[in-house]
Amino acid sequence: MPQDAYSSDLALGTNWGDRVQMQIDLQTSALRLANRQDWRTVADITGEAFANDPVNQYVFGKASSIRSMFRVMARDMYVPHGMCHLHPEGGATMWMPPGVEAAPTMLGLLNFAAGQVLNGTPGAIKRGMNLSEKMQEWHPRAPHFYLFTIGTTLAARGKGVGKSLLKPVLDACDGAGVPVYLENSNPANSGFYAAHGFERMGVFNVAGDESPVMEPMWREPLAG
């Protein structure tokens, strides 16, 4: 994956995030763009989807702790500064467009820390910080749309909700010529992402050799 292949577009001031969002066909899909009042819904669907995720279980330990983390990320970063979609049958995504810099607020970080102290397992905050550092080390420098999370409720599984969440955005990225990046935290999902054009960039352990692995994946835009 070339790190600087798309730098000329940014130098010309092209707003890829707006281009992609304009091309997403929400009218013929079941998706709805989340607004600021939807942060808890986005987070709680995501928390339910990742409750048994190997990486999140290793880092945070409990479903309540995992949900607490996603509430901070949805409220402070992805709903106000990124792009989040909701599916009526119980699905949600959190995306970040290229060139957008966002971080949790100080209050959000305090709420996260408090949530981990109350609900998490010992060492959860440190493990979370270490994972964040490793994710940053692997994160590509080349501009891209970043898929932070995609997930469904337990009741929505097996109904094609995941594909319905992903395909409209990938189609829009193809139309705008924008690559996509994600980190797969569950080996069971590798085939799903591969079927949508993602290729593995590598793999890294969350902590030591016996810890779960993350699988960074990259998708080049497909020609029309």
Predicted regions and their residues:
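Conserved acetyl-CoA-binding loop-helix of GNAT-fold acetyltransferases
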Residues: G158-D171
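Conserved GNAT-fold acetyl-CoA-binding loop/helix
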Residues: A51-V72
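A short beta-loop-alpha structural element at the N-terminal edge
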Residues: A30-D44
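Conserved active-site alpha-helix within GNAT-family acetyltransferase domains
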Residues: K163, G175, N186-V203
